[in-house]
Amino acid sequence: MKISASYWIFEGGLEGTLPVSSAMEQASQLGFDAIELGIASQGVLTHQSTKAECDSILEEAHKKGLEISGVASGESWTNSPTATDVKVRETILDFTQKALQVTQWLGTDAYLFVPGAVDVFFMPEAEVIPYDVCYERAKEGISRLVSTAEDLGVSIAIENVWNKFLLSPLEMRDFIDYFNSENVGAYFDVGNVLLTGYPEQWIRILGSRIKRIHIKDFKNSIGTEDGFVDLLEGDVDFEAIKKALAEINYDGYVTAEMIPYLPDRPEKTAAAMKKIFK
């Protein structure tokens, strides 16, 4: 497997102000094989970025000995695909159509997508959507994106996040299968499920549907967002995860998504990723 760094682990990454070249330089210096870039409606990489800009990023990545492991976005948190307001849903679908093209231009084939939310734990002002309504709107939204993803050869990789939606591996599996497309899969985050389940079970159940892996660690005894800790300091059983990944023949990217940025966190993360996976 190839170890990858999320653009968001570096200072200014989550805010979208860190130059991509600087993030790639840091990832290269820390010994990562790849970097997962972040895309937003504003910042250094957006859905309006041009092919020429993407070509330049890709060329620079190769010069630094890096691959681009995927593209991630948090736009669905503020413009939810399952919002009551149709204009909000149209806004995020338009953004995602364009972001899928940017993903292809960047030479990678996985786009991290949050399909909607029943609620948003870090935005108490956000509306609460009934689960069944959320489910139908999420299906409708992704259905409108599938043909674009297939034409571009990019996968819509649905991440399991703290959105009170798609709460079990069986439900995630069946939701993905609904679209009957090789270009819809999972961006599986091992830390995000630890509070309510076992990552290794999710991996075996999702199997080949997994397009990419996110690596985090979490302490169940804390049980809130404060439970996300540095790698090897929580309760994630990385040996069990590696065994499960081997069983499904996954040998792709494992991306450290350690947020928010803290001093020394990128260095600690790189060392831990090498210890776990190298």
What residues fall within each predicted segment?
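N-terminal pre-domain/capping segments
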Residues: M1-T108, S143, S181, E267-K278
